[in-house]
Regions:
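Catalytic cores of DNA base-excision repair glycosylases
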Residues: 2-7, 11-202, 209-215, 219, ...
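Intrinsically disordered, low-complexity, charged terminal extensions of DNA damage-control enzymes
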Residues: 1-22, 28, 190-349
Length: 349
């Protein structure tokens, strides 16, 4: 493909990475548990936000064994605010497999790592290359963006065939410094060749082999398939309080936000009369509606348009768990969709 020589990529990238990389806490270790944790946290979450969570998580659960034995509520509380809670549930499941099958020692073979719950090809490649210097690529959105521009390829980068092709071509040129090369590709895609903005081609160590730069197309790449429109769902959320306590309930063990605490809620936007009738159906006696607040929360494929009703009830019953404000803050992991209403309440407490 024109003048593209991928074999030059390691020799161009590695010196640049060693001189210019950001200092991040998970780059100071070869411990596979730490690297695995950071990679899972960094999915769908900004680097700056992850730093604090990463430190707190490892302080509370410093070993795979501690993670495997952690109580679910405590685990969810450590993860609170990161979202995508299936990530942390799979972390625990994988830790339990490591404890039972590998005597607590993180497996060092790619196929064994890939077989762990919640670990796909990207995470397995990242852990194995960074922790063990195995020559296996870790192809994420950053790497796909870099490769699309390097090769001047307009194929949508979210197609599985494109990802497989990138992985195969990278595997053929992996150097013995596999961990540094993996991180160099990620770093280039996160900084110089970043998303949603003009690439900084003048600062790029790869511009002399980059076809996108040579052809003037780098700014138009990468291409993605059209996004599916999010489904809109209306919900009414009840922030029920009695004598300084608030009603919470656990969500079902499977599905969206599985096993997490929530304020009672129902489908649709209820008017005052229907809302009061719903509270009575819950087995509670409503006293006074204190206020109503509108919020929205976006999941990957769904948008919740929520009407929050703050309401005082006569007794703390109805089959709910009743928490003080202090207990909610210390013990109950509220997903962001519901924490929006709790933060509103805390401002007024």
């Amino acid at each position: 493909m024109d003048n593209l020589d991928l074999n030059m990529l390691p020799e161009l990238l590695l010196p640049w990475y060693r001189e210019n990389h950001r200092c991040l806490p998970w780059r100071e270790t070869k411990e596979p548990y730490h690297i695995w944790l950071s990679e899972i946290m960094l999915q769908q979450t900004r680097v700056e936000a992850v730093k604090g969570y990463y430190a707190r998580f490892l302080a509370a659960l410093p070993t795979v064994e501690a993670l495997a034995n952690c109580d679910d509520d405590a685990l969810h509380k450590l993860w609170e605010g990161l979202g995508y809670y299936s990530r942390v549930r799979n972390l625990k499941k994988a830790a339990q497999v490591i404890q039972e099958r590998y005597n607590g020692q993180f497996p060092r073979e790619y196929d064994a790592v890939l077989a762990l719950p919640g670990i796909g090809e990207y995470t397995a490649g990242a852990v194995c290359s960074i922790a063990f210097d195995l020559p296996v690529p870790a192809v994420d959105g950053n790497v796909l963006r870099v490769f699309s521009r390097l090769t001047d390829d307009p194929s949508p980068i979210d197609l599985p065939a494109v990802k497989a092709s990138v992985r195969e071509r990278l595997a053929a040129i992996y150097p013995k410094e596999a961990g540094d090369f993996t991180q160099a590709l990620m770093e280039l895609g996160a900084t110089v060749c970043g998303p949603n903005r003009k690439p900084e081609c003048g600062s790029c160590p790869c511009r002399k082999i980059c076809l996108g730069y040579q052809h003037g197309t780098a700014e138009t790449l990468p291409v993605k398939s059209p996004k599916r429109e999010r489904r809109q769902e209306d919900r009414t959320v009840f922030i029920l309080q009695c004598d300084g306590k608030y009603a919470l309930e656990k969500r079902p063990g499977k599905g969206l936000l599985a096993g997490l605490w929530q304020f009672p809620n129902v489908a649709g936007h209820l008017d005052t009369a229907r809302a009061l009738a719903e509270v009575e159906r819950m087995g509670l006696r409503p006293r006074e509606i204190l206020r109503e607040v509108s919020r929205k929360h976006i999941f990957t494929h769904i948008q919740w348009n929520m009407k929050g009703i703050y309401l005082e009830v006569a007794e703390a019953s109805g089959g709910f768990s009743w928490f003080t404000a202090e207990q909610i803050d210390a013990q109950a992991a509220l997903p962001t969709a519901f924490r929006l209403f709790w933060e509103e309440e805390e401002r007024d407490v």
